[in-house]
C-alpha cells in the first residue's frame, strides 16, 4: 500500500506527489510492475464513482510536460470492482448523514476501521472487470483543450469505461425500485428480483441502519439539520434514503455511460 500525502503544506504535498508520480511512471515504463490506483480518497461514499482530477494531474507531473506523450506512456486500464454487498455501506451512510449537518471530521483510527471493515466484511459476490485500455486517440482528443479541461475530459473517458463495466446485482435493482416508490416515479430500470433477494436486502439494510443509529446516538449526532423539526422516524428514514442511493446510484452511472 502506498500512502498519499494530502493534508500537509503545499510544498510537501507537491514533493511527495512528484516522488510518487516518478515511481509509478518508472514502474510502468520499465515494465517492472503495474500499479493499481483508487480514483478517489477511498471508495466513493454515495455509490457514484467519479475520477479524481488531482490523481490524473499527479500522474503527469513526472513526465516531459507533453500531455499526449505523458499519458500514453502510463498505459491506463480502467477497472470496475462491483460488490453485491458494499462492505462499508453503513459507515458511508453515517458519514453522509453527519456531513449534511456540519463538516465531517474523521476521528482517530477511523481510516483504519474503514480499511479493516472493507477487507473483513461480507461482500457477497464480487466481480472485477478490466476494461479496454485508454486508447492513444482518446488521449489525443483531450489535447486541444485547456490544461485543466484536458484532465476533466480524460476523467470522463475513464469514468465511461468503468460505469459501462459495472456489474449490477439484484441489490442495485431492489434499491432503485424502493427509491422510485418512495419518490413517486418509475424505476430507471425494471428488473424482476426474487422475493428472497428482497428479504435479504431489507434485512441487511435494517441491520446496517440499526448500527448507524446506535453509533450516531452515542456520538450525539442523531439529530435534525439545523432548523428542521424531524422525529426519530424521520431521521431513520433519511438514513435509509442515503443507504438506498449507495446501491441505486451505480444504475444511474451505468445508464449515463452508454
Residue ranges and their predicted role:
Residues 1-19:
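Membrane-interfacial amphipathic helices and adjacent loop/beta segments
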Residues 15-35, 42-258:
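Membrane-interfacial terminal anchoring regions of lipid-handling membrane enzymes
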Residues 6, 40-41:
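Glycine- and acidic
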Amino acid at each position: 500500500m502506498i500512502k498519499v500525502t494530502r493534508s500537509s503544506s503545499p510544498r510537501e504535498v507537491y514533493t511527495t506527489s512528484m516522488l510518487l508520480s516518478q515511481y509509478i511512471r518508472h514502474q510502468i515504463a520499465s515494465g517492472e510492475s503495474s500499479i493499481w490506483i483508487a480514483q478517489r480518497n477511498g471508495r466513493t461514499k454515495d455509490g457514484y464513482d467519479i475520477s479524481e482530477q488531482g490523481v490524473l494531474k499527479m500522474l503527469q507531473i513526472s513526465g516531459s510536460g507533453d500531455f499526449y506523450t505523458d499519458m500514453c506512456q502510463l498505459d491506463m486500464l480502467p477497472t470496475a470492482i462491483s460488490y453485491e454487498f458494499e462492505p462499508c455501506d453503513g459507515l458511508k451512510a453515517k458519514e453522509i448523514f453527519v456531513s449534511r449537518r456540519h463538516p465531517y471530521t474523521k476521528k482517530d483510527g477511523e481510516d483504519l476501521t474503514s480499511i479493516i471493515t472493507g477487507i473483513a466484511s461480507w461482500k457477497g459476490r464480487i466481480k472485477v472487470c478490466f476494461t479496454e485500455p485508454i486508447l492513444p486517440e482518446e488521449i489525443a482528443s483531450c489535447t486541444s483543450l485547456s490544461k485543466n479541461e484536458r484532465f476533466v475530459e480524460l476523467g470522463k473517458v475513464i469514468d465511461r469505461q468503468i460505469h459501462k463495466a459495472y456489474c449490477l446485482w439484484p441489490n442495485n435493482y431492489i434499491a432503485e425500485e424502493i427509491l422510485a416508490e418512495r419518490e413517486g416515479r418509475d424505476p430507471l430500470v425494471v428488473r424482476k428480483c426474487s422475493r428472497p433477494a428482497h428479504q435479504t436486502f431489507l434485512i441487511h439494510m435494517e441491520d446496517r441502519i440499526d448500527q448507524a443509529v446506535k453509533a450516531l446516538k452515542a456520538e450525539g449526532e442523531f439529530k435534525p439539520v439545523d432548523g428542521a423539526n424531524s422525529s426519530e422516524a424521520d431521521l431513520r428514514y433519511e438514513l435509509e434514503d442515503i443507504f438506498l442511493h449507495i446501491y441505486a446510484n451505480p444504475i444511474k452511472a451505468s445508464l449515463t455511460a452508454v
